[in-house]
Amino acid sequence: MIRRKFSRVFSKRTDMHNIIRLLFRNPFFFLFCLFIPFDNTSLQSIGGIMTASPSALILLPGLFVSILSKGLKVNKNILLCFFGVLLISFLYYFYWVFYFPELDPIFILDRGSRYFLLYVFYFLALYYSLRQNIKDIRAGAALIIIVVIFSVLLNYLDPAIINNKSIIQYNDFISPERLRGFSLEASVFGYQIVCSILLLAVLLNWSTFFLVTVTIVIAILTTSKGAALSFLICICFYFSLKGKLMFRVLLSLCSIVISYIIFKYYFLDALASDIDTYSSVATRGTMFIVGLKIFLFNPLGVGFFGYLPSIYDFTSGVIDFIKSHFPFLNFDEVYTYTIPGEYKTVGTKSLILDLLIIYGVFFLIPFIYFIKKILKEFDAQSERNSYFLLLFIIFSNMFFISHLGSYFTPFCIAFLIILSKNRAENDIN
């Protein structure tokens, strides 16, 4: 126990030094981490969302060097799931070609192939991060935190650099009154900021009270409703599970009351404005139900080639259902999702739902197993900060994060797994 505390104190002092060492010891991973917060660069003109972040271009060379130095290790179960999804993808390709005769078969093949590449790169980012040692992953986390903090300062000091089209931003920002950083939009940046705060809390071993207080304040300041509300849900969820029954009830009630007050005074007006003026509430709500419905009707997934056609097929019925109960919502945007051939903004707005649609139970079963296993490890290690970070990642990717051009989530998951394994090994020793 004493050794564990000493190592934590020592690691606080050496994380910054390890960033410099990382540059010379593992330059590809250094660059990979450095560019993770940049997920909307002009590199999109090369390969679309897949090359939105410079990290995507560094990923394959970095992985190649890592394999040469450490060898190749692949889980057979993951390979079986991968080929199973590919088989289902091709079967659904022929199904949707006949079901939607107005859809060009080349279009389905083209879009499905693009989704395939996007997810391959996304999971390779996770695999590459998992291959790092404890010092390098900690140094990478510290580097990402520094870049995100710098982007916040730049957003205030010279917002024109952030909001206007340039080499670091593929397009102009339509909401310059909000924070954007180096990311695609305010909601993604809010996710980056909260994840960075939680990463910092894990690295520095913050107290729970300090973590919750700082994160709530910063989450509100990010102007991202999704990030702030997801963290509030994390708090309520966490305290509803911990301690004795009366303690859990008391903390849960306090969390709910505080969350309600924050929601009422900081987010209710903005949410009402969204409902009256924009279509985001109707779009996100509709597509959340669409994603669940597609999964229930296709538990094995629809594969990469069935993703868009299944959305075309299921969305109109869900719109009619929601509209009958909430006619005041604006469905203009989500109506375009029913038009065969539309693809630019079509999606569930939830990475987890997208994975359920494409992979079905091939994703759901390993996902549930992983969550249960690692949360138990965090409990055994008394790592509340890691617990909060994982919960925030889950809720955010469930409700408002779906950007496959960003590798923030794969890195954070790898960071938590590597730290958990390292703690377990230290406890055994």
From Swiss-Prot:
Membrane topology: Multi-pass membrane protein
GO cellular component: plasma membrane
Main location per the UniProt record: membrane
Subcellular compartments: Cell membrane
Protein name: Uncharacterized 49.5 kDa protein in cps region
Ranges annotated as spanning the membrane: 27-47, 48-68, 78-98, 106-126, 142-162, 198-218, 219-239, 249-269, 288-308, 351-371, 399-419
Disulfide bonds: none
Lineage of source species: Bacteria, Pseudomonadati, Pseudomonadota, Gammaproteobacteria, Enterobacterales
Domain of life (superkingdom): Bacteria
